[in-house]
Amino acid sequence: MPNEQAISGLVGVRSAIGVGAWVAPRISGRLFGLDVPGNPQAPYLARLFGARDAALAYGLQSTQGAARAQWLKIGIACDIADALAGVFAGRRGELPAFATVLVTSTALGAAALGIAALQGEQA
């Protein structure tokens, strides 16, 4: 995959998830299989997550070279942390199996795309 395609994909996914989580946190939560009605704090947490993803998208979109590579590394670290959080929550019974798979696979997919883009930046 050419590097600019990977960057564009990451910017698009992060923007969509970030804006979606901020603007419609309950809908976004349900799309990921979360029990939004059972957790009245979920919209607040979704908006925190949404702001982070939107900031990561902006950082990638607005930089080049070494600065862009740094944003990619930050995003990869966040994605790996998100994947681990999904696994831990699933193992502890804090997430249903379906939600565990969705949140973990989404985070791992974003991390893989970030790694591919980072390799392209360093080539």
Predicted regions and their residues:
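Short amphipathic, positively biased membrane-proximal segments
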Residues: M1-A123
